[in-house]
């Protein structure tokens, strides 16, 4: 995790890397994604947002507690719990999902697709509404999530979108 002042945004930003998550009601949260997925949760009543960044759905190996955030099977429940521990109300949670790029779409293993489908299915299981998804493109992206508006800015190599 890296905290810095982003001169373009004129804001304090916390950058998370694979396996990390962060919850805030003040700081913008950012990460860079390819086939990994970031789940961004919001409780608008408390201006609270949280973001995780997971690499794979699961692992067949034994995983140390420090590595669990790298796998969606742990990362999504951990993010939900972190939101609740920081004052969110589960019935107010909403989600936006990003990443899931399939750089090698012709290969038999489509990590991005598996990651994105897992996020959708898991949030449906928790009955958390998904307000936006940005998957299925063959390009990387950098995302910025804002706590006061739940706006997420996505920067691609060739442009920007707002979700």
Swiss-Prot record:
Keywords from the UniProt entry: Chemotaxis, Hydrolase
Matching Gene3D superfamilies: 3.30.1330.200
Pfam families noted in UniProt: CheD
Reactions the enzyme catalyzes: L-glutaminyl-[protein] + H2O = L-glutamyl-[protein] + NH4(+)
GO biological processes: chemotaxis
InterPro entries to which the protein is assigned, alphabetical: CheD-like_sf, Chemorcpt_Glu_NH3ase_CheD, Cytotoxic_necrot_fac-like_cat
Enzyme Commission code: 3.5.1.44
MF terms in GO: protein-glutamine glutaminase activity
Main EC class the enzyme belongs to: hydrolase
Function: Probably deamidates glutamine residues to glutamate on methyl-accepting chemotaxis receptors (MCPs), playing an important role in chemotaxis.
Family: Belongs to the CheD family.
Record-linked PANTHER family: CHEMORECEPTOR GLUTAMINE DEAMIDASE CHED-RELATED
Protein name: Probable chemoreceptor glutamine deamidase CheD
